[in-house]
UniProtKB/Swiss-Prot annotation:
Protein's recorded name: DELTA-alicitoxin-Pse1b
Entry keywords, A to Z: Cleavage on pair of basic residues, Cytolysis, Ion transport, Membrane, Nematocyst, Secreted, Signal, Target cell membrane, Target membrane, Toxin, Transmembrane, Transport
UniProt main location, coarse: secreted
Subcellular location: Secreted; Nematocyst; Target cell membrane
A Pfam family matched in the record: Anemone_cytotox
Lineage: Eukaryota, Metazoa, Cnidaria, Anthozoa, Hexacorallia
Domain-related comment: Composed of a long N-terminal alpha-helix and a core region rich in beta-sheet structures. Before the pore formation, the alpha-helix binds the lipid membrane, partitions into the lipid-water interface and stabilizes the monomeric molecule on the membrane. Finally, it traverses the bilayer, thus forming the transmembrane pore.
GO annotations of cellular component type: extracellular region; nematocyst; other organism cell membrane; pore complex
Annotated positions binding phosphocholine: S101, V134, S152, P154, Y180, Y184
Family designation: Belongs to the actinoporin family. Sea anemone subfamily.
GO MF annotation terms: channel activity; toxin activity
Length: 226
């Protein structure tokens, strides 16, 4: 009996610290997972600031931002990343997007305050279809007028090339086929690969913008006070 008590004492002396040590390790592991999750949350917040459908500080808008969000679309033959910087002194509220061809996987950012920039993407329709990413988006400005941005990334570069355009319409006007046709055919559409500057003729605003010429297109536009 005496030997059994000694044995039991030695067994407990060895087992209890080990048990506590194991428990301590598990606790550390749990904390590490929590920290990892917190970091993932922080990364998600940082990521959300540079994904399509988001609004970022206007000063952050650059082609490298558009390259990043374009990559997120994946391997699609015709796609475009659009960034529009609001330096108009006005607040913009989204109206809608009209597509001549293609679609988008994100929602047009609803509100764009002054000194902010919206990020948006479009792509050709999924599947083996000979279509491009072509359309126009519209925002109502706090002046009461509408800002329209046309973009065209065609499928057939033997017949067409990338084009873009911007116009301010009187009053509230949703994007539709008529608006698209006017901006594409009758309002001096802008060619890619060179910086364009143009007075917009209303609300004392002008534009400065650039579009790349390939099928993975990037379009950056700054709307500024004249």
């Amino acid at each position: 009996m005496r030997h059994f008590v000694v044995f039991l004492y030695m067994f407990l002396a060895l087992s209890i610290p080990t048990a506590f040590a194991k428990k301590h390790i598990v606790t550390k592991k749990g904390n590490h997972q929590d920290i990892t999750n917190d970091n993932e949350g922080e990364n998600a917040e940082k990521k959300s600031a540079t994904v399509a459908g988001a609004v970022i500080a206007g000063g952050e808008l650059a082609l490298k931002i558009l390259t990043k969000i374009l990559y997120e679309i994946g391997k699609i033959d015709r796609k475009i990343a659009i960034g529009v910087d609001n330096e108009s002194g006005l607040k913009w509220t989204a109206l809608n997007t009209y597509y001549k061809s293609g679609a988008s996987d994100v929602t047009l950012p609803y509100e764009v305050e002054n000194s902010k920039a919206l990020l948006y993407t479009a792509r050709k329709s999924k599947g083996p279809v000979a279509r491009g990413a072509v359309g126009v988006l519209a925002y109502k400005m706090s002046s009461g007028n509408t800002l329209a941005v046309m973009f065209s990334v065609p499928f057939d570069y033997n017949l067409y090339s990338n084009w873009w355009n911007v116009k301010i319409y009187d009053g509230e006007k949703k994007a539709d086929e008529k608006m698209y046709n006017e901006l594409y055919n009758n309002n001096n559409p802008i060619k890619p690969s060179t910086w364009e500057k143009r007075d917009l003729g209303k609300d004392g605003l002008k534009l400065r913008g650039f579009m790349t010429s390939n099928g993975d297109a990037k379009l950056v536009i700054h709307i500024e006070k004249s």
